[in-house]
């Protein structure tokens, strides 16, 4: 897909470097949408009788055991459909990419490592579950799909077969 997008972008007049960046962005978007679809289209999804819809896999901080499962219509317009999942990812990208007029800085920093350039500012996004939630184990569900779809675009992020567990 990426090569087709790059070829089409170059054919539309984009310089080679911009066509390659555009193709990378499109492939990344598609991979994120596929990950979202996988969350709603697997054998561990349940049916919510109150909402009348398929519920995604991660309703809690663990992969549940289910006795029966619900299937989403991937070709439809409801929860779990390609159109819905890709639309959700597109909405997220729009929010992230919309300029706020303020300078923002986002970094991934290992909480166990000293890093003094924040000068007294503390931002924590991890709830206080400590070892109760195995984030790395849960991340494997999405990681394996992303590794297969965009692992070659981001080799530093996907150099291991599964999410590294030691840092957790």
Protein language model regions, located:
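Switch II (G3) loop of P-loop NTPases
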Residues: 128
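Nucleic-acid modification enzymes, centered on SAM-dependent nucleic-acid methyltransferases
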Residues: 1-121, 133-168
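Hydrophobic residues in beta-strands of the RecA-like P-loop NTPase core, especially within AAA+ ATPase
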Residues: 124-125
């Amino acid at each position: 897909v990426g090569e087709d997008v790059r070829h089409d972008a170059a054919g539309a007049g984009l310089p080679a470097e911009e066509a390659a960046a555009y193709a990378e962005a499109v492939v990344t978007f598609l991979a994120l949408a596929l990950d979202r679809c996988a969350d709603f289209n697997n054998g561990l999804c349940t049916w919510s009788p109150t909402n009348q819809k398929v519920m995604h896999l991660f309703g809690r901080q663990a992969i549940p055991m289910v006795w029966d499962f619900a299937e989403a219509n991937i070709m439809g317009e409801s929860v779990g459909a390609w159109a819905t999942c890709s639309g959700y990812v597109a909405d997220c990208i729009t929010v992230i990419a919309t300029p706020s007029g303020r300078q923002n800085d986002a970094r991934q920093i290992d909480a166990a490592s000293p890093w003094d350039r924040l000068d007294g500012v503390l931002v924590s996004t991890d709830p206080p579950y400590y070892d109760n939630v195995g984030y790395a184990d849960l991340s494997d569900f999405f990681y394996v799909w992303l590794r297969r779809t965009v692992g070659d675009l981001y080799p530093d992020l996907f150099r291991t077969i599964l999410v590294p567990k030691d840092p957790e």
